[in-house]
Amino acid sequence: MEEMKKTAIRLPKGKQKPIKTEWNSRCVLFTYFQGDISSVVDEHFSRALSNIKSPQELTPSSQSEGVMLKNDDSMSPNQWRYSSPWTKPQPEVPVTNRAANCNLHVPGPMAVNQFSPSLARRASVRPGELWHFSSLAGTSSLEPGYSHPFPARHLVPEPQPDGKREPLLSLLQQDRCLARPQESAARENGNPGQIAGSTGLLFNLPPGSVHYKKLYVSRGSASTSLPNETLSELETPGKYSLTPPNHWGHPHRYLQHL
């Protein structure tokens, strides 16, 4: 039995013969080992642990050695020799030679004293030499010493008028010039509905024709949203209306035939 157990352990898995074979209607069971499994496991681990070789760099003698600081008689009191079994000793360089090597690439006055008072005074920032930059948080409050390089409003190119609508533009300019004295008179009378500067620009087209509308355009801030337009029909649906806003967000200042 003992010989059979050793043979079962040493033979490769492909050449092992089952000690016991059992089968039924569902499966076939092959038994390759029979005995105390703990003894086999202990033998396996004891054999594996006995083959371990300790490396030379991890021997107890090398581990017991510590770091040593030596100060020979030929060296100055400020110089110490560092020796360790884990690192390779570097060639020793005196402190004075190290300072000379570090200052080789620096000019003479700078090597003596790199932090002189004259350099500190030169590096100080004068009040008149403050940097100017624009604050992105807000445009209304400006701190002293800072200025905005750009105006608050965006620079948007004005739409170019079409040559076919020049008569309509001239008509609107004439109405705008006529609305200015009416605006001043309305302010004196206290009528807010006739003030063009505060509420908008009122276009009075010829009332005799039934194909015209009274257009009221409010002056809002230029934005991507549609402008506030109020169309009040007088008699029948008109033939003229305002064109939609262009791609810059500003409404066209002329009429377009429907």
Curated annotation (Swiss-Prot):
Domain of life from the UniProt record: Eukaryota
Gene Ontology terms, MF aspect: transcription coactivator activity
Main location: nucleus
Quaternary context: Interacts with TEFs.
Task performed by this protein: May act as a specific coactivator for the mammalian TEFs.
PANTHER family xrefs: TRANSCRIPTION COFACTOR VESTIGIAL-LIKE PROTEIN, TRANSCRIPTION COFACTOR VESTIGIAL-LIKE PROTEIN 1
Protein name, per record: Transcription cofactor vestigial-like protein 1
UniProt organism field: Homo sapiens (Human)
Name of encoding gene: VGLL1
